[in-house]
Amino acid sequence: MAGSSEGNSVAYRIVLLSSISGAACIFFFSRLTIQISEYILGHPGIGLKQDSGLSLMSGGLGGLLLGFSDSFWRNCTEAEVYSLTGCFFAATLYFGWRYFVEGNTRYFLLSCFLIGAGLCVHPTQILVLPLIIGIHLFRQYPVLVKQIAKGILIWLILNLILGYWLTEGLVFVGLQMDLILAGHSGMGLPPGYGLLLVWLLSLFGFLIIFCLSNKKISHWLGLGLLHAGLAFYCLIPLRTDSPMQLGAGKDAGSFYAYFTRAEFGKPPGIYGPSYMQNTRPSVQSSWHWDAIRNHYARIKKKEKEVEDPQGWFPRMYSSAHAEAYNQWRLDQGYTIETPPTWKENLWFFLSEQSVHYFVRYLGWNFIGRTNDSPESQVLSVNSFEDFFSFGNKRRVNYHFLPLLLLILGIPSVFFFTQKVPLFWIIGFLITGPLLVWVLNMTPDQVRERDYVFQLCMVFCFLLAALSPISLCYGLNFRAKNTMRFLSALLFITPAIQLIEGWSSHDNSKNYSALNFSEILLASCPSQSVLITAGDNDTFPLWCTQQVYGFRPDVTILNLNLLHQPWYYRRLEMPGQIGQFQLKHPLPDSLDYKPILHVEGSAMERMDSLLRSKNWSAPLVWTRYEFILASILTDMEKFEPNRSVVFSPLLPTQKILYMRAETRLNGIGRVLNFNPDTALRIHPAKHFKSILAQSGRWNPENLNHIERSFHKLIRKKGLMHATAHENPDAIIRYLGWLDQSAPPDQLAGVIPQNLAYARLLDSCGQTKQMTEFLASLSLQAVERAKVSAFPEDYCREIEEIESMIRLQHPRFKFSESWFNQDPAYPCAGH
């Protein structure tokens, strides 16, 4: 549907595919609800006759509740894969339930094929595999139902083997075969044939066993059809021929990285590192096809390897999110001086990962949300303003009606039959709590992750859809007039969902992305080069240029994509919008290892900064500064008449050394090349300085400098001081940093400030420590004078004072600073 390359039709077809997939998901979910309702009503213990009207009511109610829910509705209006994922998931559940109840093998085989095909859309489709395996064991081996322990063990083993084979093992074996056939063996086959051979052997191997087997043939045929569903992956090499391609899987190496989602990494599960543990660099490698030399090349990638000891149940593991972990631990009353214990990790899993992510997403769909921002909270019944106010289009208020239906549907699922509870519990646990544990999500997610739990929403709305059965059973409703009244009463809930969610999901007049793109492109001089850094200031601009034909003369260069070979090929293609050719090509390995790496102590770099106080260049040279310097060098030498425009979303630190030479034009910062400008910013000089320092400075040490500049420098300095490298140099460096930093950068940094004070005290510099803490108290007092919440700063002052008195009981602050100051807001506190 989305295969056309004609401007507007591409976007239209992609959105249409998402909408049609959502409609198909609702259809299969409604059919699943009707089938389960008929099964429950046909049970002799319920005492209700098998009424088709009641089943249809449950199916219609379930489809409307799911369709108008916050997360599902949002997925249907976006050009993403999650709507199509939900379609495959609902269809697999429907045919799996039919097999569970009726025992018809064709439904099992169709479910296996849909699992394989759904994996090609999104890897979360693997979550339905344990449910189908459990249903198959229940049908084929009824004795395992009585031998519960043996049945659970066999179920777990099958899930581990098939789950690994489908998500990684198949492609890994294919990569090894590809290295033999297309690698250095001299056979000269194109890349990918080894992977294709392994897939064909797996497919036809199971089918041959099926033909030769005399009993239990559904096992082998199901495995064969599951592999046949994976054939949809053959579309990936075809669809990645577009000019703009990300993660093209054209060979076994890159396809293995795509298939295993290597860019997202693998978070630890049961046993792993803590975010506070020391790390040492390790070199890992991956295989990528070298089209020039016509063979596979091993690309080395420097990564972090955690030193022992490690811990159990690691939930706080990411060193990049240390500040968020520390803040959470302080809020919970824990100390941040030692690594988190397994009890702290368990509480973080329950309170943050389970409640803040998973339960909060459920609350958005069954209760409502305070606003439409990613930080939105669930509506609280204790807040009169949130719950009973009307007219706020950003607020979504379902008045607890979907939650009430969910609670009413619990008896229908658990009290009448045995198969329905088993079906629901396995599906909910795997797509909900177990997924929370496996993902091990870090704080401050880039975008909302509620789409990950979309599959769990299906089981939750299944409970709500079965609420009519509970009401009919509990209130003994049998009359037709009563049924009509009940249906009208129940369908008020999806109507409220529709009314409340319309303003949040109606994109008919939402042109914010187009308007932003036009404003930013209009801010660029003719034939200029626009430097961008993210998705939001790149893809909408490409769409505006290529689809709407607005300002095609501007060349858009994305720093995050310039290290991709396909992006270079696109920029150099004749007739392309924004054609650009880089005269200084970057190394092929730029995508897989840092350009600059420190081998020695970081003290040398800190001391040099301390002596020179030279901020003319970025503090850390990452590959992005490397790319930017090479672009500016090229333009200064070969295209001096073209202007460079920096996107407003580009982090300031990336252009710190040339910011004074830019001027604000519209919403972009324009850099015009002329003799004076070139003399001051010296792009070629900076480019050479990077090459000269290659192998000396590791950008991974400060990879989040853009987010928290001074806090991060302070934290890294304290880490080196703890290792007893050179505490005196750290003290001098941090002292210089405090003097050069703006006051607002140091406000309220209690953990870092107290750690700095302990560092001073450990070095025997008690006087400097007390002076530093006293100055912090004075800063807190000044902020408290003008703050609407002075008690927050009073607590900060008390914490500082208690820290000093803990180490120096006789120490007292000068009374002239506090008690004699009539403006002191904490007097007598």
Where are the predicted features?
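Short helix- or helix-capping micro-motifs
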Residues: 59-67, 115, 119
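Loop-to-helix entry region of an early transmembrane alpha helix in multi-pass inner-membrane enzymes
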Residues: 5-32, 44-52, 56-60, 75, ...
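ER/secretory pathway lumenal C-terminal domains and tails of membrane proteins involved
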Residues: 34-42, 72, 77-79, 83-86, ...
